[in-house]
Amino acid sequence: FQPTWIQGKKMKGEVVGGNIRCFLKLAGTEYLPSFDGKILLLESYSGDVAKMATYLNQYKQLGVFDQINGLILGHFTEMQQKGYEPDIVSLVQEIVGNQDLPIVKTDDIGHGPDSKCVIIGELLTLGREEGNGNEG
């Protein structure tokens, strides 16, 4: 997949995550994985700004954004199709509040018929060249 870099230059770690809402169902259970040193992948089919803000704040309250090595934002179908403001990238940056956390955005991962696959649990390294907004 081709990511667009929002902030940071490199991320490396095991991929965890998936649908922003469904993955939160694991909170408080033995099935929620450790986030330490991981790359968190989040995407969503439905949900407006208020729902996304609620989900993102729950991840923040769980301490996730202080533990991960990077964040991949996939396609947020309803948010993007309806042109909600703030957009998902702005909302994430506002709620995460950590300018040192590497974040990328890609529409290649999500619920579309042409979506690409990311293997959960696989080690992933993403990086970019200086001044290049894309993967290097």
What are these regions (language model features)?
Residues F1-C22:
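Conserved anion/nucleotide-ligand pocket segment
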Residues F1-P3, A27-P33:
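Glycine-/acidic-rich phosphate or pyrophosphate-binding loops and their flanking alpha/beta elements
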Residues Q7-G8, V15, L32-S34, V64-F65, ...:
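Solvent-exposed alpha-helices and their adjacent loops that cap or buttress functional pockets
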Residues K9-K10, C22-G28, Y55-Q58:
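Glycine-rich, charged/polar anion/phosphate-binding loops
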Residues G13-E14, K38-L40, N69-G70, L101-V104:
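Structural motif
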Residues F23, L71, G121-L124:
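Buried hydrophobic positions in well-ordered alpha/beta secondary-structure cores of metabolic enzymes
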Residues E30-G83, D87:
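Internal helical hairpin/lid segments
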Residues E78-G136:
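ATP/nucleoside-binding phosphotransfer catalytic cores, i.e., glycine-rich phosphate-binding loops
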